[in-house]
Amino acid sequence: MNVLPRRARGVLAVALCSLVLSACGGSDGTDGTRGGYISGDGSYVVVDAPDRKDAPELEGEDLEGEPLSLEQFAGKVVVVNVWGSWCPPCRAEEPILSAVARELADDDVQFVGIATRDVAGARAFERAREVPYPSFADDAGTYAVQFADSLPTMATPTTWIIDADGKVAVRYLGPFTSESTLRGLIEDVQGSRS
């Protein structure tokens, strides 16, 4: 039994293909982007202090090959951002992250990136932009998935804010578009304890 007429099936197929292709936006790679990201909508989850789960024990190397772990920032609020130099929304939010990182550097707040896929491109991007915080080199995509037990990632970029007790307090999906939103979430976490 044919539920949809042939013409309706054709229209539906074209619409689905258009939707899929628009979600993979990007370029030919000449500008350093490759698409293949899923950007969030700026929605976020704030976990009440008693309900927070332990942050994963991320440990590895930064983009320069130096040892890096979340443990070295124990006692600080840590802002962890999953990004890629190939991701246009990630590139767009970098000035916001860097500005707030510089502003709060003396307030027991540490920023850390998780650079996915193209580590060489990420290293060049961080150097060119003078990003003031380290990023884990994550060619294999193994770091972000470690947040699955608390608040899993569903987009690139995704940002988590870990409280000073090492618990995941916030997950923000998509790029930050204002310093005040990021700063406000950090201040909320600073004012709460798990």
Kindly give the residue locations of the regions a language model identified.
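N-terminal post-signal-peptidase region of extra-cytosolic proteins
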Residues: 43-44, 68, 144-147
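N-terminal targeting signals for export/organelle localization
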Residues: 1-59, 184, 191-194
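A short beta-strand-turn-helix
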Residues: 48-78
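Active-site-proximal beta-strand/loop segments in catalytic clefts of secreted hydrolases
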Residues: 82-84, 114-117, 138-139, 175
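Thiol/disulfide oxidoreductase modules built on the thioredoxin-like
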Residues: 127-132, 139-191
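Structural microenvironment flanking redox-active thiols in thiol-disulfide oxidoreductases
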Residues: 91-130, 140-146
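Short active-site neighborhood of thiol/selenol oxidoreductases, capturing the structured segment around
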Residues: 68-91, 97
